[in-house]
């Protein structure tokens, strides 16, 4: 690996690490991001931290203000709605294809992820969201259209960032488990129509839960 590629890989790893801190809520909306503190936290110099913050600013996750520096951007209801409107188009596209073409080992991988989700202790939203992402990414990453898959990945990460402070009610949590099982059953029987219906319900339910919380918080 040459020096250029190594530097790019390090920047990408650092970017993912900072983004994970934001999406997990460990770096909260409105929190000031001090370059020196982040450099110490991740064991790097200040230059790559500044570059990562510029990248995060470009993607709408961070705001950089003169004399104040960088802060984690506060999510809002309009952003959440815009993301979900695109996901409502992408998700059926992926699951209908997966229902038609998924091999047994692909479905088994999803079943294993779902087992892990169901074992997550109540209230551990960081681990739950990580595994929920993996569950859906197991569908998207195998699709032939990687442009669409990369767009989905970007939107889901954005959703996790903007919704980091939101909670999942016990009722919604149970519904998510049931909807995941409904998807798995549709995949096992290669029923694309059933899979589309399940994912449409799943996405709509998540949007309702998140948008209601956003409005309640005045965002």
Predicted regions and their residues:
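Short linear motifs at protein or domain termini
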Residues: 1-100, 105, 212-219
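Short helix-capping and inter-helix turn/linker motifs at the boundaries of alpha-helical repeat units
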Residues: 9, 108, 126, 171-174
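Alpha-helix N-cap/N′ positions at the starts of helices
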Residues: 67, 90, 112, 175-178
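Conserved amphipathic alpha-helical segments that form helical-bundle/coiled-coil interaction surfaces
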Residues: 95, 100-165, 178-186, 194-204
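Short arginine-rich
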Residues: 204-214
């Amino acid at each position: 690996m040459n020096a250029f590629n190594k530097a790019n890989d390090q920047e990408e790893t650092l970017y993912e690490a900072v983004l994970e801190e934001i999406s997990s809520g460990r770096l909260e909306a409105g929190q000031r991001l001090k370059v020196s503190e982040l450099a110490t936290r991740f064991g790097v110099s200040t230059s790559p931290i500044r570059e990562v913050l510029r990248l995060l600013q470009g993607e709408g996750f961070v705001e950089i203000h003169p004399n104040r520096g960088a802060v984690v951007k506060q999510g809002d209801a309009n952003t959440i709605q815009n993301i979900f409107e695109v996901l409502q188009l992408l998700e059926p596209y992926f699951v209908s294809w997966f229902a038609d073409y998924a091999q047994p080992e692909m479905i088994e991988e999803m079943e294993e992820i779902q087992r892990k989700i169901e074992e997550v202790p109540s209230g551990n939203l960081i681990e739950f969201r990580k595994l929920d992402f993996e569950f859906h990414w197991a569908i998207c990453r195998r699709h032939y259209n990687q442009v669409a898959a990369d767009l989905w990945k970007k939107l889901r990460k954005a959703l996790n960032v903007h919704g980091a402070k939101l909670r999942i009610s016990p009722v919604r949590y149970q519904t998510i488990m049931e909807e995941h099982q409904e998807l798995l059953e549709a995949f096992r029987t290669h029923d694309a129509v059933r899979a589309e219906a399940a994912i449409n319900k799943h996405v709509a339910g998540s949007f309702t839960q998140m948008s209601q919380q956003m409005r309640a918080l005045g965002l």
